[in-house]
Regions:
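Glycine-rich beta-strand-to-loop/alpha-helix junction loops that act as flexible
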Residues: 154-160, 269-274, 626-627
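Acidic, low-complexity intrinsically disordered segments
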Residues: 2-264
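Radical SAM enzyme core and accessory elements
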Residues: 1-69, 107, 117-120, 150, ...
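Flexible glycine/acidic-rich beta-alpha junction loops that bind and position SAM and/or redox cofactors
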Residues: 55-58, 163-165, 279, 361-369, ...
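A short helix->loop->beta-strand "cap" motif at the edges of active sites that frequently abuts
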Residues: 146-152, 295, 319, 352-353, ...
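Radical SAM [4Fe-4S] cluster-binding motif and immediate context
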Residues: 201-356, 361-363, 369-376
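Amphipathic alpha-helical interaction surfaces in cytosolic regulatory modules
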Residues: 600-666
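Structural recognition of alpha->loop->beta junctions
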Residues: 166-183, 311-324, 373-388, 645, ...
Length: 667
């Protein structure tokens, strides 16, 4: 923290020039419980919730349903080596952060925890669900109607691909498309321009039950123009791409916000094909190189988009991990145009870029022999993380329309829609295939996961291998940024050393793990003391992880509850004693206009409200002091002290008139 003091004259000088209160790093303020008291009645109360836990096959859900994409759909066959990270319903926090009304977000509540919140009397309850969780949505609706009967129910999420007739019995409103605009209109709040306020959402990654990394989630866009015939997210938004963060500058502002929390934090950009928008990516690269801090960004991409960049350009954009679709050799999607994927994936790996790639089973041309041939070619590319999904129809997609027209839905699924919904998880064959039975396709899927793990070993070891490739290529680079990136890779490799001891003892490819460890030791030297201690403890941690997996212990997350503007002092327009406060959100800033008489109480409450506002988004705040506003210098100094940790994001300007000008001169 940069230490500084602000005299009243310095504050007045900065106010005249409309400049931020200083520069430099800052700590993130805790969300306070006080702000500007609203005028009149408070707005309606909003509760946004996911479906309830427990989830999983043991609780009546489809095979891959749970809380984790990696463990459930990618590294599901890797046992103790599977990285663990809970994926939340991120859109709920994003919507809540961009309303004016008080809002509470619940992530994976139990029935009891949800009931406790419902008894507080929300006016609206939003429920987010996917198609595969339709039955879970019905459970939540029943609880709402019993314990908050006056609340209006809003259904949202990709489960709303179903038609109105199917959903009408369960909701008063159906949110399809972009949720912030929908909810603001529903609550009769004025439209808000993009980019919206961006909440901080951070995920923890564990290996052998030990926290290893934190990832900040960046909401950059919705929808995808590629329009693959099976893709729900593309057709849900009518093949349109909605830029939640329109420019590279907007994205980088969020990046810097996360770096304030942790300079080494990993980042994930949620955008179906982030690199397809070259203007944003090019500007991001300029800003990343200008700052010089080596970043670790994971992004969704396509062969078409990746072919437009060199691996070095990707790294200089901060991207060192991508999710790209392999799909099938003859699937023929437009997004696969560009470099042959047989060259693309090895090239990315050789430059230190990890690759999560997805292969699909069940295309019309597939037979067991063709699937095994494609699997062998796919595994030869050594993707860091492999995913294998069954080609399936989702309402609203061209594939679904074709299957229904041809009458090829499995009869038991067609006869029981809720059974069909429950099995829309990518791990159940739902279509009558010309060459294979459903059970055969599902067995081949399991074979793919098992074969990958047996031949290529744990993905966490593959990650270290890719980082090492990047380190070897760039640790003597002419580029200062890439040298710094190589240094970060080296530190991450040494931090990950404990995985080798477990991989040698319990992994399917102990010889490969031993060779990689020896090569790394020869290049980087022995690991530091901390890594050696963790290596000694790693087998015990891995054994504990195996025990919890075998006995289904500690496999469910705890409730995550976040409240937005839930106190009577939430920052909003209103009367604060004799000080009138008016808020106006501009494109990149929130304007706070104050007028009247400023005293100690109003200064403290205004500062608390500004801190709360900035804690939940990446905007700036500009305080406009109206002409004729009366304030003693000590109250302006108090405001400055209260906002010290965030001074680089706050500015104050004074609409100077005779009385105000006299005050500033005397200050």
């Amino acid at each position: 923290m940069i230490q500084y003091s602000l005299t009243s004259r310095a504050l007045a000088d900065e106010a005249r020039m409309e400049t931020p209160w200083g520069t430099g790093p800052s700590a993130v303020a805790e969300a306070p419980q006080a702000s500007v008291k609203p005028a009149g009645r408070p707005g309606p109360k909003v509760l946004l919730t996911s479906v309830c836990r427990p989830l999983g096959a043991a609780h009546g859900d489809a095979p891959s349903v749970g809380y984790e994409v990696l463990h459930g759909q990618v590294t599901r066959a890797q046992g103790i080596f599977s990285p663990r990270s809970v994926n939340y319903t991120y859109g709920l926090d994003y919507i809540a952060a961009n309303l004016d009304a008080p809002a509470v977000v619940l992530q994976y509540p139990s029935h009891r925890e949800l009931i406790r919140e419902l008894k507080k009397g929300p006016d609206y309850v939003g429920i987010s669900f996917n198609l595969v969780l339709f039955h879970r949505m019905k459970e939540v609706v029943a609880l709402v109607r019993k314990h908050a009967p006056r609340a209006q129910i809003v259904l949202g999420g990709y489960g709303t691909v179903l038609d109105d007739a199917t959903l009408a019995p369960y909701g008063d409103h159906i949110c399809r498309g972009e949720g912030v605009a929908f909810f603001r209109a529903l609550l009769d709040e004025p439209p808000r321009p993009m980019p919206y306020d961006h909440p901080l959402v951070m995920l923890n990654l564990k290996v052998f039950s030990i926290p290893m990394d934190r990832t900040g989630v960046i909401f950059a866009g919705l929808g995808c123009p590629n329009g693959c015939d099976f893709c729900c997210t593309s057709h849900y938004f009518k093949r349109r791409h909605i830029r939640l963060l329109p420019t590279g500058d907007d994205i980088f502002r969020v990046v810097e916000r996360y770096l304030e929390v942790d300079l080494r934090m990993s980042l994930a950009i949620l955008d179906e094909d982030f690199l397809l928008a070259k203007d944003r990516a090019r500007r991001m690269r300029e800003l990343v190189l200008e700052r010089g801090t080596p970043l670790s960004i994971f992004a969704f991409a396509s062969v078409k988009a990746l072919s437009r960049y060199t691996p070095q350009e990707l790294l200089e954009t901060g991207v060192d991990g991508v999710w790209v679709g392999y799909e099938g050799k003859r699937s023929g999607y437009s997004k696969q145009q560009g470099k042959p994927i047989e060259k693309l994936i090895p090239e990315l790996r050789a430059h230190g870029i990890t690759v999560l790639s997805s292969m699909m089973l069940g295309f019309e041309y597939h037979t067991p022999e063709i699937i095994r041939e494609e699997l062998a070619e796919f595994l030869a590319l050594r993707p860091t993380y492999p995913q294998f999904l069954i080609y399936g129809p989702t309402p609203g997609t061209p594939f679904y329309e074709r299957i229904m027209q041809e009458g090829r839905m499995r009869p038991e699924m067609a006869a029981d829609p809720e059974r069909y919904y429950r099995n829309c998880d990518g791990f159940t064959s739902m279509v009558v295939h010309p060459a294979m039975q459903p059970g055969e396709i599902e067995a081949l899927q399991g074979e793919c996961f098992a074969t990958d793990f047996r031949l290529n070993g744990p993905s966490i070891v593959r990650s270290v291998e890719v980082w090492f490739q990047g380190w070897k290529r760039y640790h003597h680079s002419d580029s200062p940024y890439l040298r710094a990136k190589a240094q970060r890779w080296g530190e991450e490799i040494q931090f990950a050393f404990p995985v080798f001891r477990v991989a040698r003892r319990s992994g399917p490819t102990p010889e490969a793990a031993s060779r990689l460890e020896a090569e790394i030791r020869a290049a980087l030297g022995p690991p530091p003391m901390g890594a050696r201690v963790r290596s000694f403890l790693a087998p015990a941690a891995a054994a504990w992880t195996g025990f919890t997996l075998r006995h289904n212990l500690l496999q469910h997350p705890k409730l995550v509850r976040r409240a937005y503007r839930s106190t009577r002092w939430a920052l909003r327009s209103g009367q604060l004693g004799s000080l009138r406060v008016e808020l106006e959100r501009a494109l990149h800033s929130t304007l706070v206009r104050v007028e009247g008489v400023w005293d100690r109480a109003s200064a403290k409450r205004l500062a608390a409200g500004i801190r709360a506002h900035l804690y939940h988004n990446d905007a700036d705040v500009k305080v406009l002091v109206a002409e004729g506003t009366h304030a003693a210098s000590r109250y302006l100094e108090l405001l400055a002290r209260e906002l010290k940790p965030l001074r680089h994001r706050v500015s104050i300007s004074v609409l100077t008139g005779p009385a105000t000008g006299e005050y500033l001169m005397s200050a």
